[in-house]
Amino acid sequence: MTQQPPDVEEDDCLSEYHHLFCPDLLQDKVAFITGGGSGIGFRIAEIFMRHGCHTVIVSRSLPRVSEAAKKLVAATGKRCLPLSMDVRVPPAVMAAVDQALKEFGKIDILINCAAGNFLCPASALSFNAFKTVVDIDTLGTFNVSRVLYEKFFRDHGGVIVNITATLSMRGQVLQLHAGAAKAAVDAMTRHLAVEWGPQNIRVNSLAPGAISGTEGLRRLGGPKASSKFKYLSSPIPRLGTKTEIAHSVLYLASPLASYVSGIVLVVDGGSWMTLPNDIGRLLEFESSSAKL
């Protein structure tokens, strides 16, 4: 098998790419990707486009997604529509979906990748900080899924992939807010898979582990996060890459997974089973007076 080239830490397209799947796996499909202007969402958009898909990438920052769209189109030759949208505001979601449908005439795939996170012990977590994460992660996922269902998926079918996390699987310290929000999304995945399956809609979650070159790793692991996690105490002792996550999402969104619905696909090298909780870091946080 051809060796995959190293990933790119920054939000840039890969300098070279060797297809592991058929290049036309998503030929002429249209994917709506929240959080598509950076990190994992950006790489998902790139990998989808390298497999024949057109994309709509959305973020609150129009300059960010506009710049990302230019890079994606230049690297892949596929169409990419950048839109500004706040997943927490249903009217904004409706307007963005309407604009995407006007541009492409359809949406085949929804990737819910928008998220918010930070480190904080539960004892210092403000009511507003907790609500903000739930609003983005949980309510945002519902808002976009519900709007797309009403405007297209109910009558035409579709695929939804929710990007979640492994935090709730082992009670990760300093992550109550994100763990609870993402666990709710995993529950939503199962409920929607059951309720919307008869309309030919598949719904799955993908839970990444520690992934290099992402804002999440930088924010949660600090400025030296990549070197800090170089030798993880996990079955596959290294950080994952954005490309590896994107390939897994590609599988779930493609006809290869045509009979897969309602699952949480964990892509973390097995680290959720072996990576220890950092109780010492929890104590450091709790000894400070800072509250979020």
UniProtKB/Swiss-Prot annotation:
Which residues are listed for NADP(+) binding in this entry? 35-40, 60-64, 86, 182, 208-214
Q: Which reaction does it catalyse?
A: a (2E,4Z)-dienoyl-CoA + NADPH + H(+) = a 4,5-saturated-(3E)-enoyl-CoA + NADP(+); a (2E,4E)-dienoyl-CoA + NADPH + H(+) = a 4,5-saturated-(3E)-enoyl-CoA + NADP(+); (2E,4E)-hexadienoyl-CoA + NADPH + H(+) = (3E)-hexenoyl-CoA + NADP(+); (2E,4E)-decadienoyl-CoA + NADPH + H(+) = (3E)-decenoyl-CoA + NADP(+)
Q: Which GO terms describe its molecular function?
A: 2,4-dienoyl-CoA reductase (NADPH) activity; trans-2-enoyl-CoA reductase (NADPH) activity
What InterPro entries is this protein classified in?
Answer: DECR2-like (IPR045017), NAD(P)-bd_dom_sf (IPR036291), SDR_fam (IPR002347)
EC number from the UniProt entry? 1.3.1.124
Do you know which CDD domains this protein is assigned to? TER_DECR_SDR_a
Which keywords accompany this UniProt record?
Answer: Acetylation, Fatty acid metabolism, Lipid metabolism, NADP, Oxidoreductase, Peroxisome, Phosphoprotein
The record's Pfam families line, in alphabetical order, gives: adh_short_C2
- Tell where it localizes: Peroxisome
Q: Which residues carry this modification: Phosphoserine?
A: S287
Q: Look up the record and report any one GO term of the cellular component aspect.
A: peroxisomal membrane
**Principal place where this protein is found?**
other
According to the UniProt entry, where does the motif Microbody targeting signal sit in this chain?
A: 290-292
Q: What is a biological process (GO) this protein takes part in? A: unsaturated fatty acid biosynthetic process
Which residues are substrate-binding? Answer: R60, R88, F118, S126, F127, N128, R219
N6-acetyllysine-modified residues are K151, K291
Top-rank taxon of the source lineage equals: Eukaryota
- Which family does the entry's similarity section mention? Belongs to the short-chain dehydrogenases/reductases (SDR) family. 2,4-dienoyl-CoA reductase subfamily.
The record's note on quaternary structure and interaction partners says: Monomer, dimer and oligomer.
Give the function comment from the record.
Answer: Auxiliary enzyme of beta-oxidation. Participates in the degradation of unsaturated fatty enoyl-CoA esters having double bonds in both even- and odd-numbered positions in peroxisome. Catalyzes the NADP-dependent reduction of 2,4-dienoyl-CoA to yield trans-3-enoyl-CoA. Has activity towards short and medium chain 2,4-dienoyl-CoAs, but also towards 2,4,7,10,13,16,19-docosaheptaenoyl-CoA, suggesting that it does not constitute a rate limiting step in the peroxisomal degradation of docosahexaenoic acid.
The name this protein carries in UniProt is Peroxisomal 2,4-dienoyl-CoA reductase [(3E)-enoyl-CoA-producing]
> Quick one: which gene encodes this?
Decr2
